[in-house]
Amino acid sequence: MNATSIGVDLSKSVFQVSFANAAGRIVERKRLSRQQYERFLVQQPAAAIVMEACATAHHWAHTAREHGHDPCLLHAQYVRPYVRRNKTDAADADALLRARRDPDLKPVPIKSLDQQALQGLHRIRQQWVTTRTQRINLARGLLAEFGISLPAGAAGIVRRLHETVDGVPPPLIAALAPILDEIKAIEDHLKQLDRQLTEIAKTDPDMQRLMTIPGVGVIIATAMVASVADIHSFARARQFAAWLGLTPREHSSGQMRHLGNISKRGDGYLRIMLTHGARSALLLAHRQANKGEHTLTSLQQWVLELERRTHHNKAAIALANKMARIIRVTSTRAQDYSAR
């Protein structure tokens, strides 16, 4: 057997492996346990290892690379059309080998271990923010039934709950106490994690460069470096904005061209963070405009004029799109953003 490329359908305990020769013809198939697959990577001569970009894919990509193989991760959505007839593990492994031969199908860049760890911090932070919001909404909804209106924000709700408990039955007050403790604990965890991200950003030149862009702070800068394995893989800045789902969805045919709302494809967390950053930059532009039009940068003038012609939300999304393009340019050129 002279296999030059190997398709692997990953799972927790069983790995389906297909072997293809230089002509792309599948010459053998195997079904391996986890231990057998680990030994296989050590003993198999160097080859291209093709896998779906799914859970554990980065671990196996790093392991394959350590043993001299050339790992390749493909997006599962784009591999699916190459599955013939019924879906089985063997069919999925075969489809990976067919998809790899498509010149228009770009592989998913493999993240470094540091990028994976940094992305893990952001996933933990995201989960804490979600949990905190759920607890606050629960307390707010329950107390609203007793005529208590709570302010927005975690700090406001904790302070108000300690001040106002008149008319609330004691059993409910007792049940809300651990929820309040949980909200305060999550607040402390978030502050600690944000300090950790700040320390990481201080020592990373790429993050420092990103933070020269209006609306980009520690959270966006660290999230970008963690999530985008290789920004040079985007040939143009517009491709990067499209990858983030910040470009219009298109439905065109013949002479008719229709552009809809933004596609919202790609990394939703990055898109949300960029949108928050854009709203912050837009608010700053308004404050700057109050000091005089002559104090505005060209980017601020552009977004304020766009807001006057359209809508605040559309202007914020357009600015997020612009920020994504600036991020790609400053990163590929390795230079700070210079406001004009």
Task: Name what the model sees in each region.
Residues M1-R340:
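A detector of single, family-specific signature residues
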